[in-house]
From Swiss-Prot:
Optimum pH is 7.0-8.0. Pfam families: Meth_synt_2 (PF01717). This is Methionine synthase. It is an enzyme of class 2 (transferase). Keywords: Amino-acid biosynthesis, Metal-binding, Methionine biosynthesis, Methyltransferase, Transferase, Zinc. Binds 1 zinc ion per subunit. It comes from the Archaea. Is activated by phosphates. Belongs to the archaeal MetE family. GO terms for biological process: methionine biosynthetic process; methylation. Catalyzes the transfer of a methyl group to L-homocysteine resulting in methionine formation. Can use methylcobalamin and methylcobinamide as methyl donors, but methylcobalamin is not considered to be the physiological substrate. It was proposed that, in vivo, a so-far-unidentified enzyme catalyzes methyltransfer from 5-methyltetrahydromethanopterin (5-CH3-H4MPT) to a corrinoid protein, and that the MetE gene product catalyzes the further transfer to L-homocysteine. Is not active with L-cysteine, coenzyme M, coenzyme B, glutathione or dithiothreitol as substrate. The gene is metE. Gene3D superfamilies: 3.20.20.210. InterPro entries: Met_Synth_C/arc (IPR002629), MetE_arc (IPR022921), UROD/MetE-like_sf (IPR038071).
Amino acid sequence: MITTVVGSYPATPREPETLRERISSFIGSYDACRPAIETAVRDQVRAGVDIISDGQVRGDMVGHFAEAMGGMMVKDGVSIIFSRITPPAGSIGSDDLIYAIKILRKLTDDESKGVKGIITGPSTMAHASKIEGFYSPQKRERAIMDMADALRVEAEHLQDAGALMIQIDEPFLSTGMVDMGTARRAVKRISGALDVDVSLHVCGDISGVIGELLTFPVDMLDLEFAGRPSNLEVLAEKWRGDKKLGFGCVDTSTEVVESTDTIKNLIERGADIAGEDNLYIDPDCGMRKLPREAAFSKLRNMVKAASEF
């Protein structure tokens, strides 16, 4: 079974320590997030994960994109749409992705391992932002589709930078706040432009949306099951077998480290529904809020459990 992560990892930016780093800081070229990316990559590789991330160390999933998009800004921690949304002047995440790949290749020569590119989805970006201009707060469809066009450009940048796959994070899809038809069209704007596999990550209770999620034009649905075991029953009723399933099997909302047997038992239930060959094994969600040791231990046990199939 292939193992992966959802994205974020508890690796914090670091102030310059060495003489070279202090000189770089003095001339304005030191990047405090580079050491955090290296920590995230090293931990994921050490745990044995197949498809890793750069750790998403540069801030929250909405603000990081809003700061770069045309027509958007972040003020007092709030993402704001003030004009028409347009693509950023350059790629938001390609440099970090390339650096993560560089570190990965230093650590292993296994070409089957790679780094995923991650974008926050258009519906989540639009619904998590305050609209102050150009679009109607009551009717966000136009904002969502313009967001999709801008994010498509970023996804293409990530693909060109060497991403093994692209993940679209859409946590808002399980909330009931989103028009699913618009969300589907927006995702298609992105996935239809890519050659690599595309995964759609949706956390939360999927009981009200699983039927529609299964119609989204993506190669994989990534869902949480450790923290929400009821999602297994929902999936069993609707699963059609035409996609891969990102199977969240460690709970990222608690520091408690699941045993290998606990994880393995959950994976077995998922395999009974979707088939072993269709499962990609990963955590429920991002791991940013966990202590680093807990995050690493969860990944290590997850990989060990997956290896027993």
